[in-house]
C-alpha cells in the first residue's frame, strides 16, 4: 500500500537539517519564520541565550489588515519585525526559513524585512 507523503513531516525533517547549520548569536541573531494556514509569525532569536528578542505576527494589535494569510500580510509582518529589531539595535540577522520553500509568503516576509533595514 502506498502511503501519502505528509508535507509537514517532510518540512520538519528539512528544518531539523537546516537548524544543525544555522545558529543565531548575540551579534547576529536568527530570524525564524513559521507559517500556518491562517497566519504567519516571525521571531528574532538569540540561540546562545535561548531567548526571543523580538517577535511579530498577523495576530499583533498593530497589524491592521483584514486578511492574514496572503503575501500582503507577510510583507506587513516583515516590516513590523524589522522595525522592532532596529529599535532594539539589531541590524544583521541569519534567516531561518523554517523548512519552507523560499517562495510566496516566506519570500515576501524576507524581502519586506530587507527593505525595512535588516541585513541578511
Swiss-Prot record:
GO BP terms = translation
Post-translational modification summary for this protein: The protein, when overexpressed in E.coli, contains a phosphoserine, which is required for the protein to bind to 5S rRNA. It has been suggested, based solely on amino acid conservation, that this occurs on Ser-57.
Q: Supply one GO CC term from the record.
A: cytosolic large ribosomal subunit
Instruction: Write down a Pfam family by its short name.
Output: Ribosomal_L18p
CDD domains, per the entry = Ribosomal_L18_L5e (cd00432)
- InterPro entries membership: Ribosomal_uL18_bac-type (IPR004389), Ribosomal_uL18_bac/euk (IPR005484)
Would the keyword Phosphoprotein turn up in this protein's UniProt record?
yes
Report keywords, A-Z. Phosphoprotein, Ribonucleoprotein, Ribosomal protein, RNA-binding, rRNA-binding
TM region positions:
none
Q: Name one GO molecular function term.
A: 5S rRNA binding
The protein's superkingdom reads Bacteria
**Record's subunit section:** Part of the 50S ribosomal subunit; part of the 5S rRNA/L5/L18 subcomplex. In B.stearothermophilus only 2 proteins, L5 and L18 have been shown to be part of this subcomplex, unlike the case in E.coli and T.thermophilus where L25 (TL5) is also found.
Q: What family is this?
A: Belongs to the universal ribosomal protein uL18 family.
NCBIfam families given in the database record: L18_bact
Q: What does this protein do?
A: This is one of the proteins that bind and probably mediate the attachment of the 5S RNA into the large ribosomal subunit, where it forms part of the central protuberance.
Q: What is this protein called?
A: Large ribosomal subunit protein uL18
Annotated source species: Geobacillus stearothermophilus (Bacillus stearothermophilus)
Amino acid at each position: 500500500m502506498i502511503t501519502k507523503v505528509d508535507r509537514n513531516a517532510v518540512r520538519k525533517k528539512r528544518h531539523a537539517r537546516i537548524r544543525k547549520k544555522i545558529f543565531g548569536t548575540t551579534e547576529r541573531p536568527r530570524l525564524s519564520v513559521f507559517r500556518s494556514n491562517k497566519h504567519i509569525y516571525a521571531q528574532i532569536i538569540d540561540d546562545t541565550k535561548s531567548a526571543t528578542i523580538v517577535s511579530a505576527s498577523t495576530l499583533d494589535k498593530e497589524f491592521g489588515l483584514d486578511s492574514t494569510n496572503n503575501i500582503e500580510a507577510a510583507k506587513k509582518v516583515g516590516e513590523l519585525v524589522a522595525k522592532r529589531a532596529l529599535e532594539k539595535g539589531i541590524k544583521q540577522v541569519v534567516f531561518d526559513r523554517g523548512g519552507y520553500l523560499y517562495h510566496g509568503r516566506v519570500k515576501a516576509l524576507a524581502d519586506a524585512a530587507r527593505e525595512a533595514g535588516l541585513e541578511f
